Design a protein with these regions (language model features):
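Clamp-loader machinery-focused feature within the broader ASCE/P-loop NTPase space
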Residues: 1-136
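Non-catalytic interfacial helical region
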Residues: 4-9, 15-18, 92-217
């Protein structure tokens, strides 16, 4: 198909992860929200989309669902990368034949930013593709997970829960995102991308539960 996905920072829709959303809502409503989370799952399943979705929810002060209205004041600044209470760390673009890792200097800069005075009650640090943390960048993040500043929530996304030092894993609440049913992926392709029904069904069957992968088949 080679269709263009909506970048997670702009994507207000999350497909097929209702159990994960419900778990986050329960944790928030309990009044004892863990300060660190790991969203794990295969590439294209919606990990970063969920992280931004939950970040918008927290920055908006919560609600009945994780879906923040499109006209809410947090939506525009988050999409523009300009919300003062949201800091994002991700790997730099990889060169040919290389696998980029999250740099220790980027982690340190993000931690410095997130510790500054906020405009709201909650600040959010997203570490996207956290499985690319190397030893130095993981150690830089560890202190914030050990002694989190008040009001800071850290959201990591990764392709597996076992790709971190145990010292980091033990300080995170873990959510494994589940494969999305083929029928849901096919219907989504038809609805949002106007893909023919037979083509959508074939792509969904090959995508192994990953909407993002279905766009490239």
């Amino acid at each position: 198909l080679s269709l263009e996905p909506v970048p997670p920072v702009h994507n207000l829709d999350l497909l097929g992860q209702e159990p994960a959303e419900a778990a986050l809502l329960r944790a928030w409503r309990s009044g004892r929200l863990p300060h660190g989370w790991l969203f794990a799952g295969r590439s294209g399943i919606g990990k970063a989309t969920l992280a931004y979705r939950f970040a918008r929810f927290l920055l908006a002060g919560g609600g009945d669902t994780l879906a923040v209205p499109t006209d809410h004041p947090v939506v525009g600044p988050v999409a523009a990368g300009a919300h003062p209470d949201l800091v994002v760390v991700e790997p730099p673009p990889a060169g040919r034949g290389t696998r980029a890792a999250i740099r220790v200097e980027d982690v340190r800069a993000a931690i410095e930013r997130i510790q500054r005075t906020s405009v709201g009650a909650t600040r959010v640090l997203i570490v996207d593709q956290a499985h690319t943390l190397n030893d130095s960048s993981a150690n830089a993040l560890l202190k914030t997970l050990e002694e989190p500043p008040a009001g800071v929530v850290v959201l990591l996304t990764a392709e597996g829960v076992d790709r971190f030092p145990a010292t980091i894993r033990s300080r995170l609440a873990k959510l494994r995102l589940q494969p999305v049913p083929d029928t849901a992926i096919a219907a989504w392709l038809e609805r949002h991308y106007e893909v023919a029904a037979d083509t959508a069904a074939a792509a969904a069957a090959l995508a192994a539960g990953s909407p993002g992968l279905a766009l490239w088949l």
